[in-house]
Swiss-Prot record:
Full protein name: Protein Churchill
GO cellular component, one term: nucleus
Organism ancestry: Eukaryota, Metazoa, Chordata, Craniata, Vertebrata
Biological processes, Gene Ontology terms: mesoderm development; positive regulation of transcription by RNA polymerase II
Family listed: Belongs to the Churchill family.
TM segment ranges: none
Organism: Mus musculus (Mouse)
Length: 112
């Protein structure tokens, strides 16, 4: 992966977990051909392991096919929550947890 192609390595994206696409605002331009254009997504794979979905793919420069970053996105269900994570040199790191129940138990107030 190429740290010279990005503005910031692994930027913190909060809860924004991308299953596909590219975070072009963080793309400084290709360190090999010096062009700043759209990215190609290649080598996309989806694996399921122990109830967890793992999506991986490579971000490539559209012009010279230089590998800019490797993207990993995971999805799983733990108890009553959907959990998402993303880790990518270009797109950043993020995680999110969402309740699958109609009322999120984390946001319920205690009644005394």
């Amino acid at each position: 992966m190429c740290g010279d192609c990005v503005e910031k390595e692994y930027p913190n994206r909060g809860t924004t977990c991308l299953e596909n696409g590219s975070f072009l605002l963080n793309f400084a331009g290709c360190a090999v051909c010096s062009k700043r254009d759209f990215m190609l997504i290649t080598n996309r794979s989806l694996k399921e392991e122990d109830g967890e979905e793992i999506v991986t793919y490579d971000h490539l420069c559209k012009n010279c096919h230089h590998v800019v970053a490797r993207h990993e996105y995971t999805f799983s269900i733990m108890d009553e929550f959907q959990e998402y994570t993303m880790l990518c040199l270009l797109c950043g790191k993020a995680e999110d947890t969402i309740s699958i129940l109609p009322d999120d138990p984390r946001q319920m107030t205690l009644l005394f």
